[in-house]
Regions:
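Short, charge-rich amphipathic segments
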Residues: 24, 55, 82-93, 133-140
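Alpha-helical transmembrane segments of multi-pass membrane proteins
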Residues: 7, 11-19, 98-115
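Hydrophobic alpha-helical transmembrane segments
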Residues: 1-63, 76, 80-81, 162, ...
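Secretory targeting signals
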Residues: 28-39, 43-70, 77, 102-166
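Secondary-structure boundary/capping residues
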Residues: 15-19, 87, 98, 131, ...
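Helix-loop-helix units of permease transmembrane domains in multi-pass membrane transporters
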Residues: 78-107
């Protein structure tokens, strides 16, 4: 049953996942080409100068892609269940409800993590050729809040889709926008170093909101 659930979720989300992965790879490649062009024309030293003096990590075009992937996967996964009224049937399958929801969320989370890891690896592999380890670390830490925001957006999107009460949908949406906006509020590189671990833990706890929406749906708390 578990394999069937995972396969079903993969079928629903693979299109969004592959598009998001392709877009991330393309944007990472674009940033690498930008760095390579600057290095070819003005030398690697100029890249270091830009990164240290102007706080330009050459990853700006990647800022909102993980967020879009998180929202897209959440919609692709949960919206068809609700629009086609399949979710109630899903909850009545001969399998633990909590494990089923966990499996569904695990698939979405794995896809978001995969996009984040692939993007990071592409950037890091190139940067390690021309930058000091300290600068490479700075680039990764600058991107990390964007990946956390993707996880937060995914869980909130899933929770909003499942929630059956309009007022609760609006409240969850506003809360989600507020939390995600907070993760993009810092303009400087490594702006969230001191609280990054806290945000990672908080992002995973957002999965509880999905369970809350599932419980309310099962109890018939809908408009």
């Amino acid at each position: 049953m578990l394999k069937a659930i995972i396969y079903k979720e993969w079928l629903k989300t693979r299109g969004v996942f592959l598009i998001g992965l392709l877009l991330s790879v393309c944007m990472a490649g674009f940033e690498i080409l930008s760095m390579n062009r600057v290095g070819t024309v003005k030398g690697v030293e100029h890249i270091w100068q830009i990164m240290l003096m102007k706080d330009n990590m050459f990853v700006n075009h990647l800022t909102f892609i993980p967020l879009a992937v998180g929202v897209g996967v959440g919609l692709a996964q949960m919206l068809p269940e609700m629009v086609q009224k399949r979710f109630k049937l899903t909850l009545h399958l001969p399998y633990s409800q909590n494990r089923m929801v966990l499996a569904m969320l695990a698939v979405g989370l794995a896809e978001i993590v995969a996009v984040s890891v692939v993007t990071s690896v592409i950037v890091v592999v190139y940067d390690m050729r021309i930058l000091a380890p300290e600068l490479v670390s700075r680039v990764v830490l600058t991107m990390s809040p964007w990946f956390v925001a993707a996880v937060v957006a995914y869980f909130f999107t899933a929770a909003v889709c499942i929630e059956g009460c309009r007022v609760q949908k609006v409240a969850l949406s506003l809360l989600g926008v507020g939390v995600v906006s907070w993760l993009f509020a810092g303009d400087a590189p490594e702006a969230y170093n001191g609280v990054l671990l806290l945000f990672v833990v908080a992002s995973l706890l957002c999965a509880l909101l999905v369970y809350r929406s599932v419980y309310r749906f099962k109890e018939g708390l809908q408009d």
